[in-house]
Amino acid sequence: MAFPKPIANTRSATGIPTGKLAIWWLLASEIVIFGGVLMSYLMHRMSHDEWAFQSMHTSTLHGGINTFVLLTSSLSAVLAHNEAEQGNGKGAAKYLYFTIGGALVFLLIKSHEWYNEISHGYTITASPFWSFYYVAAGIHASHVIGGAIVMFFVARGAAQGQDLHRVENAGLYWHFVDLVWIFLFPLLYIAK
């Protein structure tokens, strides 16, 4: 008895593989979430002068290093996709593990940064700025964690030569996570 193809390998009515279409729908919903947070942040920042003072206490060094880490991890996601396109599952897995390593480094730096800020009294309840800061950065960090978990399972399958099409989908998600950080970094760390 032949089993039907898994749905993620089939094509939708648009001709786009259903797995890729699902990722694009997920990213569209994430844009709504992050877009709302960012627009709310901008509106509050423009109408509250004390936000500039509060933002002076964020660590531009930590944010800058994390930006470099995420951009580098995005490069390794691209290299993973190239390996998957060539049918090299082990190579794709290797680069996905590098990407996961970047996620872990990002989270370690973010944890250190938050520890320093909290120990200096800059908690989520200290001011509206710090509430937005922790919510925006926390939502982003949760997406970094989620992306790393997904990439781990995709890398495991890729190492065995299975479901190499998922490498691209994981990469699309990871690039979105990086893109969100590209918006958060200047708003939270540079615009002081």
What are these regions (language model features)?
Residues M1-K192:
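...captures the hydrophobic TM-helix bundle architecture rather than a specific catalytic motif
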